[in-house]
Amino acid sequence: MASNPEEKSNDRQKALDNAISQIEKAFGKGAIMKLKQNPVEKIDTISTGSIALDSALGVGGLPKGRIVEIFGPESSGKTTLALHVIAEAQKKGGLCAFIDAEHALDVMYARKLGVNTDNLVISQPDTGEQALHIVEYLVCSSAVDVIVVDSVAALTPRAEIEGDMGDQHVGLQARLLSHGLRKLTSAVSKANCILIFINQIRMKIGVVYGNPETTTGGNALKFYTSVRLDIRKVGAIKDKESIKGNETRVKVVKNKVAPPFREAKFDIMYNEGVSKLGEIIDIGAKLGVLEKAGAYYSYNNTRLGQGRENVKNYFKANKEVANEVEAKIRDLLGNSDNSITMEEESRQLLEEAVF
């Protein structure tokens, strides 16, 4: 006679409870648990400084407790974006560190982006091993919210530095990163911090079909990252003949916390960074937060100015109004991510406004 399914289920539950008890005795309480004992809450994030990119990431910013890679060509805005993340974390009272492996951090530029350099922890390591050890100590302290490593290509192994100029060191940097990331991944999660690696692009030799571009440091970083951002300069912003900034596009090529492959476009202005005011004007007009009639913009029946630059100047002089408009935009975009019942047409309009 077959056993009662209910009795069989109870026996299996008892066996599982016994196994959990043994695991807790061996490794300590909390080593294993049912998910209902530790319910998953909304992902904690830090803003990137760009409304469009925060929306493209799907959770309102970069997720805490994760490793992030920002890569792209030279002068595309990689370090600028990372410094904006630091500035946003500091606004929330967070502590941040910058591992300047390239020895090229412009402190004055960082201040212009809103970074409090007096409270920024900075290190300029001599070798890749030293850099990863410093990162490990900072992560394990659980005191730092954001750590930026600039850049992966500059994490030179000690053997390469101590060797002669013509020596071959095949795969040495890739092995260094692979070993370091194995140790750092769980520590970053437990510390609930964001570890950002800035990376450069190289060209594969002999590639005829497909994309010849690749990033430095091997494949380990691609696997261990939860978010990978491909940042590109797609145009120039001109004022008559002089260039004032760059039109920038960021593609989320990997995302473990939301749907990937979304894109965000925004302006990076020289000596200013990401033009949040420009985003407020463009996205606000598309979402209907700002009223646009020809070249004139209005908000709550108040005319803001004629032309985009004049409206920017108005927002600079009236920061409370700018913050109010930004809050309404973020509220609309936040609802679009979290609302299951939103009509498909409304969701599409919001995505068109941002992406």
Swiss-Prot record:
<comment type="similarity">
    <text>Belongs to the RecA family.</text>
</comment>
<dbReference type="GO" id="GO:0003697">
    <property type="term" value="F:single-stranded DNA binding"/>
</dbReference>
<dbReference type="InterPro" id="IPR020587">
    <property type="entry name" value="RecA_monomer-monomer_interface"/>
</dbReference>
<protein>
    <recommendedName>
        <fullName>Protein RecA</fullName>
    </recommendedName>
</protein>
<dbReference type="InterPro" id="IPR049428">
    <property type="entry name" value="RecA-like_N"/>
</dbReference>
<dbReference type="InterPro" id="IPR003593">
    <property type="entry name" value="AAA+_ATPase"/>
</dbReference>
<keyword id="KW-0547">Nucleotide-binding</keyword>
<keyword id="KW-0238">DNA-binding</keyword>
<dbReference type="GO" id="GO:0003684">
    <property type="term" value="F:damaged DNA binding"/>
</dbReference>
<dbReference type="GO" id="GO:0016887">
    <property type="term" value="F:ATP hydrolysis activity"/>
</dbReference>
<dbReference type="InterPro" id="IPR023400">
    <property type="entry name" value="RecA_C_sf"/>
</dbReference>
<dbReference type="GO" id="GO:0005829">
    <property type="term" value="C:cytosol"/>
</dbReference>
<dbReference type="GO" id="GO:0005524">
    <property type="term" value="F:ATP binding"/>
</dbReference>
<dbReference type="GO" id="GO:0140664">
    <property type="term" value="F:ATP-dependent DNA damage sensor activity"/>
</dbReference>
<keyword id="KW-0963">Cytoplasm</keyword>
<keyword id="KW-0227">DNA damage</keyword>
<dbReference type="InterPro" id="IPR049261">
    <property type="entry name" value="RecA-like_C"/>
</dbReference>
<keyword id="KW-0067">ATP-binding</keyword>
<keyword id="KW-0233">DNA recombination</keyword>
<dbReference type="InterPro" id="IPR013765">
    <property type="entry name" value="DNA_recomb/repair_RecA"/>
</dbReference>
<dbReference type="GO" id="GO:0006310">
    <property type="term" value="P:DNA recombination"/>
</dbReference>
<dbReference type="GO" id="GO:0009432">
    <property type="term" value="P:SOS response"/>
</dbReference>
<dbReference type="GO" id="GO:0006281">
    <property type="term" value="P:DNA repair"/>
</dbReference>
<keyword id="KW-0742">SOS response</keyword>
<dbReference type="Pfam" id="PF00154">
    <property type="entry name" value="RecA"/>
</dbReference>
<dbReference type="InterPro" id="IPR020588">
    <property type="entry name" value="RecA_ATP-bd"/>
</dbReference>
<dbReference type="InterPro" id="IPR020584">
    <property type="entry name" value="DNA_recomb/repair_RecA_CS"/>
</dbReference>
<keyword id="KW-0234">DNA repair</keyword>
<dbReference type="Pfam" id="PF21096">
    <property type="entry name" value="RecA_C"/>
</dbReference>
<dbReference type="InterPro" id="IPR027417">
    <property type="entry name" value="P-loop_NTPase"/>
</dbReference>
<feature type="binding site">
    <location>
        <begin position="72"/>
        <end position="79"/>
    </location>
    <ligand>
        <name>ATP</name>
    </ligand>
</feature>
<comment type="function">
    <text>Can catalyze the hydrolysis of ATP in the presence of single-stranded DNA, the ATP-dependent uptake of single-stranded DNA by duplex DNA, and the ATP-dependent hybridization of homologous single-stranded DNAs. It interacts with LexA causing its activation and leading to its autocatalytic cleavage.</text>
</comment>
